[in-house]
Design a protein with these regions (language model features):
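Nucleotide-activated donor-binding/catalytic signature segment of Leloir-type glycosyltransferases, i.e.
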Residues: 191, 222, 230-264
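A short, histidine- and acid-enriched strand-loop-helix "catalytic/donor-clamping" loop
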Residues: 49, 97-112
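Donor nucleotide-sugar binding/catalytic pocket of nucleotide-sugar-dependent glycosyltransferases
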Residues: 126-140, 145-164, 168, 174, ...
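Acidic donor-binding loop of glycosyltransferase active sites
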Residues: 264-279, 294
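Conserved acidic donor-binding segment of nucleotide-sugar-dependent glycosyltransferases
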Residues: 310-322, 331-337
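A short, well-ordered alpha-helix in the C-terminal region of glycosyltransferases
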Residues: 327, 331, 338-353, 362-365
Length: 372
């Protein structure tokens, strides 16, 4: 059996960096391990330059419909860019089943016309994979998609990639509290160190205020756009908060999973402070922390499929709760043995449930259902 694999990111760039050992396979949502489960993959040829949404949809449809290699199903990380193909499937003009990851809950539209169009659009999907049961439960409240098409997938990290990074750092004999991007002499207290990465829906004011009060060492990575005409809301939010000297703000540009993972691996705790959302904001950082065996302090997002407190791999804090963040940071800082155990439990959870090989196995099982 063979699938056509579509991704909103540049697949060829990802594969090239993977071959160089600088890109984790989980960003391809199990596609790299489908062959281990009896499914070959035709990789979508991503456009060389960024296109508008309409042009992307046209380009993708052209690539999918004119593919010379035989394939039995279409597997995608997102429906963005696939809209025309999905509509053709809904009309019965595209004969291959479509299996797609759905990143947000399906919601009912206020407009009757948009709701009717949405219900028709969702007929074009044969399987919708969600990151958590909460996303499925919320989606069932909107009568757009057939409940039988909704499933929960365990998206998780490329464990071998993070094990390789940890081995590299051990070989280089770099102390966990020594970060390449800062001068440790700037801080009287460089251990334990906390690290914040990611960009989606981050609540920088709450995080910075908590660390301003605690005086604990935070390395805060902020993704920026090099184009001066493009706003950088995350950076602007950080600058307005006036971080104290114990907070190192590091500006980064581009997709740098290997470089960032090396820095995360040197930290003692990963912090993920987000605004309230309807989706799994911060999940990429969560699975990375679990893979590296680090404790996590995270905003209490019910969409994320990890209950940190119950599973003992971290601490959850309510949205916008500065004092709650202070308490969590101080607990990790003053209970190093428990923090270490949290990290070990998180790694065990990654090995058992949240890893790329399990993700691929589940996806392969859903794809094979359409070969009968």
């Amino acid at each position: 059996m063979k699938v056509y694999f579509y991704h909103t990111q540049n697949i060829q760039y990802c594969l090239r960096r993977m071959a160089e050992g600088e890109f984790p396979s989980h960003f391809l949502y199990g596609a790299c391990h489908l062959a281990d489960n009896g499914i070959d993959v035709v990789y979508h040829r991503s456009p060389k330059h960024e296109l508008s949404r309409l042009k992307t949809a046209l380009y993708t449809a052209w690539r999918v419909l004119t593919c010379r290699e035989h394939y039995d199903a279409l597997y995608a990380t997102h429906y963005k860019g696939l809209e025309l193909v999905v509509l053709l499937r809904a009309l019965g003009l595209f004969r291959k089943p479509i299996i797609v990851w759905h990143h947000q809950p399906i919601v009912k539209s206020k407009s009757r016309l948009r709701e009717l169009l949405g219900r028709f659009f969702y007929k074009g999907f044969d399987r919708l994979i969600f990151f958590s049961q909460k996303l499925v439960d919320d989606s069932l409240k909107a009568p757009k998609a057939d409940p039988r098409k909704l499933v929960v997938g365990h998206w998780g990290a490329d464990l071998a990639f993070y094990d390789k990074i940890k081995a590299e750092l051990k070989a280089e004999q770099i102390s966990p509290s020594h970060h390449l991007t800062i001068s440790p002499s700037q801080h009287l207290n460089t251990s334990p160190s906390f690290i914040a990465t990611g960009k989606e829906q981050r609540d920088q004011p709450t995080l910075i205020e908590a660390f301003n009060r605690t005086g604990r060492h935070l390395i805060l990575y902020i993704g920026i756009n090099p184009n001066p005409n493009v706003p950088n809301p995350n950076l602007e939010a950080v600058e307005r908060c006036e971080p104290a000297d114990n907070i190192d703000v590091v500006k980064i540009c581009g997709l740098l999973p290997y470089e960032i993972a090396r820095e995360v691996a040197k930290a003692d705790c990963v912090v993920i402070c987000c605004h309230r959302t309807r989706y799994t904001a911060g999940l990429t950082t969560v699975v990375e922390a679990l893979a590296l065996g680090l404790p996590v302090i995270c905003s209490r997002n019910p969409q994320i499929p990890v209950d940190f407190d119950r599973l003992g791999c971290g601490i959850s804090v309510e949205y916008g709760d500065v004092e709650g963040w202070q308490r969590a940071v101080e607990y990790i800082a003053t209970h190093p043995d428990e923090a270490r155990l949290m990290g070990e439990r998180g790694r065990a959870l990654a090995e058992q449930m949240f890893n790329d090989e399990r993700c691929a196995k589940e996806v392969a099982e859903w794809i094979k259902q359409f070969s009968l």
